[in-house]
């Protein structure tokens, strides 16, 4: 993780105390301490001028977890490894306390220090969980716009663990959770199902079953949209028919069915489903496609009425102007067609549209 970007304040929070005459601890390197703890040491000095060992230990772990290139980080890492068992136990306590205080940055610093010292898969997972905490805190500020690099690193770390241990339930489950948060429903379902297969814990299995149930329907809708995109209309219909409860957005199911039937040339069913979809949403894409299906069925006046509804509510819908212009052209209402093509051209120009403008201008003059 880019500590200088996400943990910049910590670089100024660390101070160093020089030891007299080379010092007897830490091989003579300066003693680290957080600035707040230095103040505490001054206000509450220990017996015979001794420093609080926990203050020193905390600062060493912060330095190690913050940046391996930080001054004396290697010295502190070496010292902590010499006392590995006690260090790991103490770090676990600090991680727990930081988590209880919702201090995501300290959780990360201590978890990352633990990863650097030992580096087990469990340590790497805990660091990545902590990175998620930092990402989530940033997301509240700008919906993740400034943290895409962090999210990518989080996903890469989970994927790397899965490469090394394909049956790692925790990593599979975590990656499923990340994809679910990003509305990548198919991938979320895939990783949850893999985690379910690998888990031996009944409690986790039940949690995963609930997660799969949550993403199953949006995953089916996403899959149907993919089939639709590639012109595989029968598969799109089959997939969407597996959605029993019509999800929380029945308009999406109706829209997919309508477009699939349109692709198959069944315009009557296409109109029925697209009309149903239009009852749930007035989105321009849905209404434009509904109008096209009406026109394909020969109901051009109804199609024009739908397109008119669009442009009256959204004067920047270029597609609706073009579509209505084409229908006016087919009805030999060249003045109306010319007006719509000009409106579309003002929103976004292209050569083909300009040719239609010139053509309808001439035809309108002959009317």
Language-model features: locations:
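Structural marker of alpha-solenoid helical repeat scaffolds
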Residues: 116-117, 164, 198, 246, ...
